[in-house]
């Protein structure tokens, strides 16, 4: 399993609510269109300030952590080739320009290691 992680920042002037609304009602569907048949999971995780008392939401370097899981390198390569096609790029870039600060986009593939944790008792 290969995971692609992308850190994305909303375009200046776009509120957090507007950003999430557009991503979840429009941009997500573009992603699903080009990832279908290649990816096994596609998630968006919207960042919030963990210590709101000492940090303003505007201090976050990114607004969303996007994760895409592929069953292997061939599936990821095929998806990336499709996404790189001229017709896909026209659609994707046009929407990204409405939504993201494109200069700040960062993508990484990651190796995951998971720890099994003991069960937490209810009410803890």
Predicted regions and their residues:
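Macromolecular interaction modules
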Residues: 1-124
